[in-house]
Amino acid sequence: MLRQVIHRGLKASFYWLGLFVSRHPVFFLTVPAVLTIIFGSTVLSRFKPETDLEILVAPTHSLAKIERSLANSLFPIDQSKHKLYSDLHTPGRYGRLILLARSGGNILELAEQVLQVHKKVLDMRVNYKGFNYTFAHLCVLRHRDKRCLLDDIITIFEDIRLAVLSNSTFSKVPVSYPNTTLKDGRVSFIGHQLGGVALPANNRDQQVKFARAIQITYYLRNLGPVVQDIIAEKWETEFCKLVHQLATDSQELHIQSLTSFSLWRDFHKTGVLAKSEVLVSLVLVLLAATISSSMRDCLRGKPFLGLLGVLTICIANVTAAGIFFISDGKFNSTLLGIPFFAMGHGTKGVFELLAGWRRTRESLPFKERVADAFADVMVCYTMTSSLYIITFGMGASPFTNIESVKVFCQSMCVAVLVNYFYVFSFYGSCLVFAGQLEQNRYHSVFCCKIPSVEYLDRQPTWFKTMMSDGHDLSTHHDSVPYQNHFIQHFLREHYTEWITNTYVKPFVVILYLIYASFSFMGCLQISDGSNIINLLASNSPSVSFALTQQKYFSNYSPVIGFYIYEPIEYWNSTVQEHLKTLGQGFNKISWIDNYFHFLRVVNISASTKSDFISILKTSFLRSPEYQHFVDDIIFSKNGAEYDIIASKMYLVARTTEKTREEVVELLERLRPLSLINSIKFIVFNPTFVFMDRYSSSIISPILTSGFSVLTILILTFFLVINPLGNFWLILTVTSVELGVLGLMTLWNVDMDSISILCLIYTLNFAMDHCAPHLYTFVLATEHTRTQCIKISLEEHGAAILQNTSCFVIGIMPLLFVPSNLTYTLFKCSLLTAGCTVLHCFVILPVFLTFFPPSKKRHKKKKRAKRKEREREREREREREEIECIEVRENPDHVTNV
């Protein structure tokens, strides 16, 4: 009883809302238009892009950020970033080059050309307020001699050039890999500076004879003042221009560059590239909506209502964008999906309202028809809009650890709210005016009076076709004009009969088993998309640089800083063995290993604290080949003696081309050791900030959204008229969600911020389209399930087809935007629409004929009502016979009357 009361109360509320809108159409048309003008004007004036890529795509809360703060407090990262090599996420300002020998050549034979490029970079000038700045003014300085810090590969190539100039070959310069000894005696790790190395099979000393590429990084100071950063930014811009020119002019070298702003530039480039495609998408959706809303009936066709519906959602999106920027929001390229997602939800409400209008009785006044359409449609549309807000609201909650996902979900919630208001206000007003025109028999396109039948009979055929309403004027109130819509006609006359055919059902079951098996297979192969390349423009310099880097410089992992942040007894043999165990399997760049090697060479023992620290400070750190280790140790003076309170060393692991996955494994292996080990240490690399707990962070929004929807649908079991509707909706949405997840994985889509947002949208898109379909079936009172599913398809099939076709047509232009982000958005959106249509038109119509709810009780009720009516007719007949007998027996009385 409570369920019926709630349902009737909601329908009555929306009926009165429809009446209110129909009585004040000008007000509800004007207010949204004024709001759009007010908020839309702020889009251009307050538009600001988000410039910090780390804020957007890195997990907001992670141990890596805490470890970075601790490491930076001990050893400033800006001073040691040249040792903490990271492939794409080097902190601060910098410029990086990859020089690749063309035609498979040996880069070691091109030392002169490499050094010429290097010299041009050093000589490049940047003008700021009349002063010229070069790299020497901006570079990171070495502590020992205050000279610019350069990669050791430059020193090696200078030695090779000198050897060539002295009529020797480059092979005379000993270059080992990955560790090589320089002329000053220092041992340097060049695994990330020399790439594509081929070592002879019988080469015991690892001497390099052939290499394909070198990588040079120019580190800039980060002093803090705004002026310094502006000059550094200008230097990076000029650096990119210079490299582009050198790459064009060079015949022997293929040159690529990367700077600190390159990733952001190519991430933001997606939004710039997609401008024209978004406009094309809008035009295509307008055409599709107009055509799909048309009928041959010029009185009831109303193609402009489809067009006005799309325009309603467009101005709603403009208003939502204005609200976003007024609240200090910053644009990023992931927000590109909001117009498409909002259009997919908004046009569903528009087409359902249009279908509801056409189902109303034409004999009613147009205001009551609008109210009936609201009562018929807005209950379900309100429910699905509420679920949109709940799911995306959970995505915007503190449980979400990715800022780009949180910003997107917040914006989507605002867009859905504004869409909902505009659909019942602006579009409701359009429906009122269209109804008034229809009631006064005005043409749906030309807005002129439709001539009488007698007048049309005297006109040519083309005029009759354009001006005829397609119905006999004397009988059009008794017909159902909506059934003449071409989609409705196809569903009623052809599709419903075919899909419910007994011989079709086995093939549908087989199709679903194939669908489920492929989905399950894909779900077992899910991989996280922590690689930032998935979000960049596909033909951008950053993507080309990253692919070259992965091909030639992926033999070794990023350099992992190993920071010991508490005093330990370095002179103790047990501690030394412990440190060796921790670094086992890594290529180490360690002051302590070099110190023990130094002690062995000079044949000195340092088994006590005083000897260990005394020799370390007075001999080891003053030797030219070991001076660079001064920055790796922090001493404290306690009275007359010194203590080592912290130190660091660097670890590098051997990897394959799947570097990112292996780095995540390294982090997961080392971090637990730091928590349970007696030596208190942390490990850090700038890449860890983007990779630490990324998988769990990116999955949590869809888990919280899915759990919230499941909870809501279960809690409302006792509030809806038939709980089986909720049960079927849960099963259907789960099937669609898992199908999209599995199939997108098979389509090479990783779990990144875009794909996870698409999965949240899939939940809502499936509910938006399946809920009216399922509830109509559950509440139908026909004799059989087959008849009920036919009625459900006839009522909602046209709106589902109209909306999904407009949605798919709208996302098609995204395929032509050269960006990995839009490719992901297109793939996931296409799978979402495809799986939803498959369930609405193929799987559900067949499976609902097998399983509950049963329609026998309705059949029994109808049989009982029919028997009751037969009894009433029998009694009526008996009364008539008695009256006839009385009339025959008393004719005089009848005559007198």
Curated annotation (Swiss-Prot):
Extract the PROSITE patterns matched here: SSD
Identification of the protein by name: Patched domain-containing protein 1
Q: Which GO terms describe its cellular component?
A: dendritic spine; membrane; plasma membrane
What are the TM regions of this chain, as residue ranges? 25-45, 271-291, 306-326, 335-355, 377-397, 414-434, 506-526, 701-721, 727-747, 754-774, 806-826, 831-851
Keyword field:
Cell membrane, Cell projection, Glycoprotein, Membrane, Synapse, Transmembrane, Transmembrane helix
Report the coiled-coil segments: none
Q: Where is the composition biased (Basic and acidic residues)?
A: 867-881
- According to its UniProt record, where is this protein mainly located? membrane
The SSD domain, residue ranges: 273-433
Q: Does the keyword Nucleus apply?
A: no
The text of the family note is:
Belongs to the patched family.
Q: How does it sit in the membrane?
A: Multi-pass membrane protein
Q: Where is this region: Disordered?
A: 856-881
Q: Which InterPro entries match?
A: Patched_domain-protein (IPR051697), PTHD_SSD (IPR003392), SSD (IPR000731)
Q: Where is the composition biased (Basic residues)?
A: 856-866
Q: What does this protein do?
A: Can bind cholesterol in vitro.
Which Pfam family, an example, fits this chain?
Answer: Patched
Q: What is the annotated localization of this protein?
A: Cell membrane; Cell projection, Dendritic spine
User: Which residues are tagged as glycosylated in the record?
Assistant: N132, N167, N179, N332, N572, N603, N803
Task: Give the matching Gene3D superfamilies.
Answer: Multidrug efflux transporter AcrB transmembrane domain
